[in-house]
Amino acid sequence: MTSRPETKIPDEITSPYPIIGAGTIESGFGRGSAELGIPTANIPVTSELNKLETGIYYGWCRLVPRNQECAAKQRSDGKKVYFNNGTKLADDELETFPMAMSIGWNPFYNNETKTAEVHIIHKFRENFYGADLRYAVMGHIRPELNYTTKEALIADINKDIEITKDALSKPSYEKYRTKI
């Protein structure tokens, strides 16, 4: 594993941030929750996200339910996933929350496609596959790394989450909470 570089969060937001966007939540591989205990919401890699270096980013996000028929869909591993389009989200789950976003290939899992995986720093009661996720990427934490153990990967993700919370507590970042 390449060693984790030190993360320095600037007091003020610097270009190219913020990057404001949205995407509809897709089913992923089911690893975030099941294997790592850190659920993620997968969204399409937009042209704006694709311009960023692979790595881990911090920012704000919020879920927006979609008025669409609910349906079960089959994931790439054969498991059926229920898309409720966010219609089961409670009012307190529609607020803006901090997020840590991974953009890249997930070398630990040898992914063949580039993904954008968002860990929303909030405990949700229901899944929300099919909902829209609006986001503001506020900055970069670190490059994408490979790991020799799942435990090392989990430890680094948890560190990313703490860095995200600390960064977004700065006044210059906090003001963007209401802009998405």
From Swiss-Prot:
One of its GO terms (biological process) is FMN biosynthetic process. Zinc or magnesium. It catalyses: riboflavin + ATP = FMN + ADP + H(+). Mg(2+) binds at residues 40, 42. InterPro entries: Riboflavin_kinase, Riboflavin_kinase_bac/euk, Riboflavin_kinase_dom_sf. Keywords: ATP-binding, Flavoprotein, FMN, Kinase, Magnesium, Metal-binding, Nucleotide-binding, Transferase, Zinc. GO terms for cellular component: mitochondrion. Pathway: Cofactor biosynthesis; FMN biosynthesis; FMN from riboflavin (ATP route): step 1/1. One of its GO terms (molecular function) is riboflavin kinase activity. It comes from the Eukaryota. It comes from Meyerozyma guilliermondii (strain ATCC 6260 / CBS 566 / DSM 6381 / JCM 1539 / NBRC 10279 / NRRL Y-324). This is Riboflavin kinase. Its EC number is 2.7.1.26. Catalyzes the phosphorylation of riboflavin (vitamin B2) to form flavin mononucleotide (FMN) coenzyme. The active site is at 117 (nucleophile). The gene is FMN1. Its cofactor is Zn(2+); Mg(2+). SMART domains: Flavokinase. Belongs to the flavokinase family.
